[in-house]
Regions:
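Membrane-embedded alpha-helical segments that form the functional core of polytopic membrane enzymes
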Residues: 14-63, 76-98, 161-176
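Structural signature of transmembrane alpha-helix termini at the membrane-water interface
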Residues: 17-24, 46-49, 78-84, 103-106, ...
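C-terminal membrane-associated helical module and adjoining short loops/tails
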Residues: 1-5, 14-15, 34-41, 115-195
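Multi-pass alpha-helical membrane architecture of UbiA-family
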Residues: 4-7, 79
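Cytoplasmic juxtamembrane interface segments
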Residues: 2, 11, 95-121
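Juxtamembrane helix-capping/reentrant segments at transmembrane boundaries
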Residues: 1-4, 47, 51-69, 115-127
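Core segments of transmembrane alpha-helices
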Residues: 10-17, 68-77, 104-105, 127-139
Length: 195
């Protein structure tokens, strides 16, 4: 197994540790979870660059890399929902992202069974980057709140502002998620009809 594929697998292996850090309430648990998410996100940047620059692109990598992204992002969103960071309507973006990811994965599986590999397109990459940025900003804001709370500083107003910023970024990434899903479907509709 080559280095880019190992980095992709590392991203998946980090997910259970991320879940524990998110859901087990201990001092600065958002900092720990955010660091794990950050390391996993960095592997996403490097696996593709290394694969392309060293001519190590494989069918496994084309399939597993976006799958690892889906697992990481969906896990983060579900954890945010569980701990109340996405608010009353937070389930809506999570459901939209989940539906899109299942639909695109279905397209990929149908294509793979016919010997065709559906690689990520630019809209899929924009979607992933916007999700990673939104999630990372939420972590950064939660770490600020953890520090302020540790210093016994009132966080009421700051917490509310952070809540709206974080939710706005998640909803923006959800728009990109919808666009990329529609484009995937449009680009592969003729192939799906034939199968």
């Amino acid at each position: 197994m080559n280095l880019p594929n190992k980095l992709t697998l590392l991203r998946i292996i980090l997910v259970p540790f991320f879940i524990i850090a998110m859901l087990v309430n201990f001092p600065f648990h958002y900092l720990v979870a955010g660091c794990i998410f950050g390391v996993a996100s960095v592997t996403d940047t490097f696996d593709g660059k290394i694969a392309r620059s060293r001519n190590l692109v494989t069918d496994f990598g084309k399939f597993a890399d976006p799958l690892a992204d889906k697992i990481l992002v969906l896990t983060a969103l579900v954890c945010f929902l569980q701990v109340g960071l996405l608010g009353s309507f937070g389930a809506i973006p999570v459901i939209i992202v989940l539906f899109r990811e299942f639909a695109v994965s279905g397209i990929r599986l149908v294509a793979a069974s016919s010997g065709k590999v559906v690689a990520a397109n630019i809209w899929g990459k924009i979607k992933t980057v916007s999700q990673m940025v939104g999630i990372s900003v939420i972590f950064a804001m939660q770490v600020v709140l953890e520090v302020l709370n540790a210093m016994k500083v009132s966080t009421g107003f700051v917490s509310e502002v952070f809540y709206y910023i974080g939710n706005g970024l998640i909803w923006l990434s959800t728009v990109f998620t919808l666009i990329s899903g529609i484009i995937y479907l449009k680009d592969n509709i003729s192939f799906l009809k034939d199968n």
